[in-house]
């Protein structure tokens, strides 16, 4: 926590085991900052307010952020992914969303996805937990085992997120499916379906 107080998200250990490993940032500080702001604003707006500052983030702003993330990562070539950005628990959801987006671009590019598919994948990745904004913060940040009722509420976040996005944005069906199904497993287990 002293490092965090001083503004350092983490440190690298330089010893005989790390010789020859070059650590590169996956995103530039500017792109990371923009992405965090967009994700924060997506979670922070007031659903019941008509005030302009409480309106959802514009689709254009989200798309520009996604483009910058994808282009920033693709321009770095082969990089060793550094995902040290899980800060404190209160900010976890924002950093988690960015980390999932970064990993999605890296995996999608590795599998040979075209740029348009990477944009859709990254949009779904960065917004995958948006449904959590409709849940009680006590459930999201619980420091105890959730009750059965709390677990059932938490398991609704993919559907809440997909419904919210469908009602407020014009993303592709693949983006909505990615948000809706991000806790589904190949064997049919998982949720919400």
Named regions from a protein language model:
Residues 18-155, 159-180:
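Acidic/His-rich, divalent-metal-binding segments that scaffold phosphate/diphosphate chemistry
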Residues 1-14:
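His/Asp/Glu-rich acidic catalytic environments and adjacent acidic regulatory segments
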Residues 183:
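Glycine-rich beta-alpha junction loops
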Residues 191-193:
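Acidic loop->beta-strand submotif enriched in PP2C/PPM serine/threonine phosphatases
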């Amino acid at each position: 926590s002293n490092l965090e107080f001083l503004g350092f998200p983490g440190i690298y250990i330089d010893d005989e085991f790390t010789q020859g490993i070059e650590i590169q940032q996956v995103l530039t500080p500017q792109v990371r900052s923009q992405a965090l702001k967009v994700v924060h604003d997506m979670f922070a707006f007031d659903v019941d307010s008509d005030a302009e500052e409480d309106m959802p983030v514009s689709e254009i702003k989200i798309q520009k952020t996604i483009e910058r993330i994808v282009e920033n990562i693709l321009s770095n070539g082969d990089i060793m992914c550094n995902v040290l950005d899980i800060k404190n628990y209160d900010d976890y959801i924002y950093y988690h969303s960015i980390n999932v987006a970064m990993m999605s671009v890296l995996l999608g590019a590795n599998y040979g996805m075209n740029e348009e598919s990477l944009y859709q994948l990254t949009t779904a990745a960065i917004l995958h937990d948006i449904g959590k904004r409709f849940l009680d913060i006590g459930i999201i940040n619980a420091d105890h085992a959730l009750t059965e009722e709390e677990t059932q509420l938490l398991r609704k976040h993919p559907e809440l997120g997909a419904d919210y996005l469908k009602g407020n944005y014009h993303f592709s069906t693949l983006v909505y499916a990615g948000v809706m199904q991000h806790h589904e497993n190949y064997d049919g287990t998982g949720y919400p379906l």
